[in-house]
């Protein structure tokens, strides 16, 4: 089970939002590269970056911070990034800069042809981000709910060749209410590619629950507010996941 610390970037700083609201931002660090180093030193095997300004602007807005993070840890672990990726040129720029994966969210829903082209041009490097509330997909930094069912879109995007799916339950993100295990497993069972859970991770019990469903295709979980607020000790959580995986492998 991959525990993936999130570094959300707003105006060059590392912040956390409550339910995607840019006006409810808590600044956790003015040095995102140092934050990246901290998580890697604590045992992170992948990092999840979000360009929050980019998500709302539709183009890259935190390049300096992203490049600083990649300079710091990009040679050691894979780094993935979402937010504002709307063109093949942007995908190429980010991959050339050293990102391992780019996450396409809103653009995948609004312009599936772009996602298909990206998967063809950059096979193995494209993750799709599906944000949902009550099973329906949301776009544009969560500000718009669509009529699309998550599983329908996931199956379509799997056919395009996406590497994996980051699935966020909007109702729970930044609220420390626990991961929506049921919805995440339902999605993972419907597709043949890995699903990364996101939104609501709050404690070690969530880690236990996720490890139990890893065999269904839930590959990892993005760790956000809980590891910044101190509700969840990241190193202890990764250790717990590794121990559980060992027990399950030996069972």
Curated annotation (Swiss-Prot):
Record key words, sorted: Amino-acid biosynthesis, Cytoplasm, Histidine biosynthesis, Isomerase
Native species: Burkholderia ambifaria (strain MC40-6)
Enzyme Commission numbers on file: 5.3.1.16
Broadest EC class assigned to this enzyme: isomerase
Major location (coarse): cytoplasm
A GO-annotated cellular component: cytoplasm
NCBIfam families: 1-(5-phosphoribosyl)-5-[(5-phosphoribosylamino)methylideneamino]imidazole-4-carboxamide isomerase (TIGR00007), PRK13585.1 (NF010112)
Catalysed transformations (reactions): 1-(5-phospho-beta-D-ribosyl)-5-[(5-phospho-beta-D-ribosylamino)methylideneamino]imidazole-4-carboxamide = 5-[(5-phospho-1-deoxy-D-ribulos-1-ylimino)methylamino]-1-(5-phospho-beta-D-ribosyl)imidazole-4-carboxamide
Active site, per annotation: 8, 131
Listed HAMAP family: HisA
GO annotation (BP), single: L-tryptophan biosynthetic process
PANTHER family: 1-(5-PHOSPHORIBOSYL)-5-[(5-PHOSPHORIBOSYLAMINO)METHYLIDENEAMINO] IMIDAZOLE-4-CARBOXAMIDE ISOMERASE
Protein family: Belongs to the HisA/HisF family.
Protein name per UniProt: 1-(5-phosphoribosyl)-5-[(5-phosphoribosylamino)methylideneamino] imidazole-4-carboxamide isomerase
Subcellular compartments: Cytoplasm
Molecular function (Gene Ontology), one example: 1-(5-phosphoribosyl)-5-[(5-phosphoribosylamino)methylideneamino]imidazole-4-carboxamide isomerase activity
Biological pathway: Amino-acid biosynthesis; L-histidine biosynthesis; L-histidine from 5-phospho-alpha-D-ribose 1-diphosphate: step 4/9
């Amino acid at each position: 089970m991959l525990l993936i610390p999130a570094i959300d970037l707003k105006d060059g700083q590392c912040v956390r939002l409550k339910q995607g609201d840019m006006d409810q931002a808590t600044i956790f660090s003015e040095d995102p590269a140092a934050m990246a180093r901290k998580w890697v030193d604590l045992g992170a095997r992948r990092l999840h970056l979000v360009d929050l300004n980019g998500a709302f602007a539709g183009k890259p807005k935190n390049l300096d911070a992203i490049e600083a993070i990649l300079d710091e840890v990009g040679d050691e672990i894979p780094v993935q990034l979402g937010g504002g990726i709307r063109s093949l040129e942007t995908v190429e720029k980010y991959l050339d800069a050293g990102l391992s994966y780019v996450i396409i969210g809103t653009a995948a829903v609004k312009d599936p042809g772009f996602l298909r082209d990206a998967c063809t041009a950059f096979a193995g490097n494209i993750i799709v981000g599906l944000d949902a509330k009550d099973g329906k997909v949301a776009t544009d930094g969560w500000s718009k709910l669509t009529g699309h069912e998550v599983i329908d879109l996931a199956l379509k995007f799997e056919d395009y060749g996406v590497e994996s799916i980051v699935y966020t339950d909007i109702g729970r993100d930044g609220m420390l209410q626990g991961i929506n295990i049921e919805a995440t497993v339902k999605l993972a069972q419907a597709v043949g590619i890995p699903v990364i859970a996101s939104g609501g991770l709050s404690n070690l019990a969530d880690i236990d629950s996720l490890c139990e469903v890893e065999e269904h295709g839930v590959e990892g979980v993005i760790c956000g507010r809980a590891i910044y607020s101190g509700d969840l000790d990241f190193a202890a959580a990764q250790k717990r996941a590794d121990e559980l995986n060992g027990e399950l492998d030996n069972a």
